[in-house]
């Protein structure tokens, strides 16, 4: 298996759902960390969802509070996500939150004879 560590970052400049990470084709990912920081000096909230390959949306964090000028680690355990699944983030207020996701991408090893 080919394993690669990646990170994805977004500055939430709107209140629209924003794609943070899409698992690549033929890959499983283990999300190790989702860090959210608030940089305006005002408390805010964030919503994080997982969309599966059938377009079903699952709430991971619904209106999660982030303290003023604070940084929060949202995961207490790794999160396994499958090929083509999507992590989306939505800020309650634009231009306050930054999000960094760290993951290990695992691709199946090619077998040759």
Residue ranges of predicted features:
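C-terminal interaction-tip segments
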Residues: 1-29, 33, 90-113
């Amino acid at each position: 298996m080919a394993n690669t560590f990646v990170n994805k970052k977004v500055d939430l400049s709107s209140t629209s759902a924003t794609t943070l990470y899409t698992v690549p084709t033929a890959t499983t990912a283990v999300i190790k960390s989702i860090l959210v920081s608030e940089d305006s000096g005002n408390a805010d909230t964030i919503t994080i969802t997982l969309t599966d390959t059938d377009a079903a949306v699952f709430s991971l964090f619904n209106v999660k509070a982030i303290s003023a000028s604070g940084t929060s680690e949202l995961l207490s355990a790794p999160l396994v996500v499958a090929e083509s699944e999507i992590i989306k983030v939505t800020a309650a207020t634009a231009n306050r939150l930054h999000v960094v996701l760290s993951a290990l991408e695992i691709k199946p090893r090619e077998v040759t004879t």
